[in-house]
Amino acid sequence: MYKRQVTHPSDSPKNLRLQAQLQGWSFPYLYDKNQNFAKDLKAACTPDFYLFSNEGDGDFLLYYHGQLDDSRPGNNIPLSGKDLRSAVKDLNQDNSYPSNQMPSLGCNIKWTPGKEPSWFK
């Protein structure tokens, strides 16, 4: 029987719930216990932003995958969310798929040892 190895207890659902309360987060977040959702998205780091368009027939298409904005720890650029906000605005205005999507930059996803996706190895 496989026993999940806890390598980052601070990322547990209980601790994330506490962090959300302390930080005043009002947005939903997903606990991906088996990391299948992250693998399906080919996620690599956090934070990583995905915006889907609802096609109205039960299908959702990936419209934006990228950074929140140009801010990074230590670069003194204030958080603005401009890249994600621009993508949301474009999607709401039925504009075409944004061609300039900057990849996210952050901490690698902590994959379960032995269960890392092929692109991570």
Named regions from a protein language model:
Residues 3-4, 28-30:
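Structural recognition of the beta-strand scaffold that forms the well-ordered cores
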Residues 118-121:
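Glycine-rich phosphate/pyrophosphate-binding loop
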